[in-house]
Amino acid sequence: MKCNTLKLTEQDQFINKIKNSESQITSFYEYDAAKKESFYRRLKTPNNGREFHLSRVIKSYMNELKLTHQQLNNIDALADGAKVVIGGQQAGLFGGPLYTFHKIFSIITLSRQLSEEYDTPIVPVFWIAGEDHDFEEVNHTYAFNNKETTLKKVKYHTMTPPDSNVSRYTPDKNELKASLNHFFKEMKETVHTQDVYQMCVNIINQFDSWTDIFKGLIHEVFKDYGILFIDAQYPELRQMEKPLFKEILEKRNQIDQSFRETQIRKTQQQLPSMIQTETNTHLFIHEDGMRQLLNFDGTYFKLNKTEKRYTKQNLLDIIEREPERISNNVVTRPVVEEWLFNTVAFIGGPSEIKYWAELKDVFDTLNVEMPIVMPRLRITYLYARTKKLLKQYNLSIESVIANGVEQERQHFVREKASNNFINEVEEMKIQQQELYNNLFTYVENNHDNQLLLEKNNQIHLNQYDYLIKRYLLNIERENDISMRQFREISETLHPMGGLQERVWNPLQIMNDFGIDVFSPTTYPPLSYSFDHLIINP
């Protein structure tokens, strides 16, 4: 496998501005992610003293997995005070989109590079966002169907979707296997299909909760890199978080004010606000089988789905006795994560790093220093067949990844069409308009007849447009093979108008190139980059 760097012309320049250390962006973070001195300074910060306890919690969470010696060594290193590189993601169906794996690779790559450069152990940690309750975001994925050269949606179906955290949700294993069968039915069968399929079946059989099944998959793929996992909703972790939950509750007004004032400053810098929330408490509680947002009305903390209300003391008592019932929203989650870990760098997706830019003052309010915030690696897999098609149609990979192929496809069709035919039809439209302009002179004093002529004229003009459209459609049908190839290029490199990694599932890559395609022995060694990476499997 080979890896190359690609510089894309992107409409969104946020990451490029981080790369270029532009103050418009860097002023919203504690550290400049593009400067080497930031890492040196961050590594010198004292530890928080929670590392040993945290290592025991992580070991407990990963206890049902068969840990590799790399993972055991990293748990020991964490206990001894090693700092971490961390990032997280929701638990998507069958691993979710490729960018989940790419975030894990980002964490692994940066931790390895920092370990080597500073001659000190840096532990890679992946945070599973098990407290999330938006099941519609994680219950589906896509498979590329080669025969139809199109992506097919594959969904886990249930009549009773969870109202609470996905960590609390136990899916029906038969339905999950039915979704898995659907996924593999859409893909072409290869010499690797049975191995990948059986791996997934074994994981579904072994684990019960939605996030544990996800954990089992990413562990199987990434265990040899030594990466550690933790679920945000893990009860032992919630026990550790009790002091900070209480502080968040006590400082809710300052937190809310800090967050909203930063959003205003960000808007004044012509940067759009990312976080949309009406709560002033920034915590959820598990109540009546649902994850419900708390909001303070001046007297009581009320819920967004039921009529129940709490005093501050009620909530402090719940935090003390049942902290697993409390969870964070988008404003407080990053602070809790960094309060727990001695983090060198947080790895986020493009949207994540934007909303972190709204939270620096929230970190300061809770006396937690924001770590270095780094954009994750962005990766596209270029199949040999796709590369051949790009050459066949003289397409640049940079342009296709950024913009798709629709313009080039239309140009191809027009090249195959008769310009004389199209020009004649366009000339007929002009003559038609001239004729009706003359007719208008005879009815200029009759409004009803003017409307009649306008309507009739438009009908005829629409017919000429329809004639050209159907003519070009017939040209497309005559060149069906080329149209399928353009669609294949688009669905592979620019699916749904975006990046491959936002749509394609990692199991597709494993099915095509082997169950060990993401392993250290097969995957190309990566170097951290702000640019786009192209991997040729």
Swiss-Prot record:
Residues 415-439 form a coiled coil. InterPro entries: Bacillithiol_biosynth_BshC, CC_BshC, Rossmann-like_BshC. Its EC number is 6.-.-.-. It comes from the Bacteria. Transmembrane segments: none annotated. The keyword Hydrolase does not apply. One of its GO terms (molecular function) is ligase activity. The keyword Cytoplasm does not apply. Keywords: Coiled coil, Ligase. It holds the Pfam family CC_BshC. NCBIfam families: thiol_BshC. Belongs to the BshC family. Involved in bacillithiol (BSH) biosynthesis. May catalyze the last step of the pathway, the addition of cysteine to glucosamine malate (GlcN-Mal) to generate BSH. This is Putative cysteine ligase BshC. It comes from Staphylococcus epidermidis (strain ATCC 12228 / FDA PCI 1200).
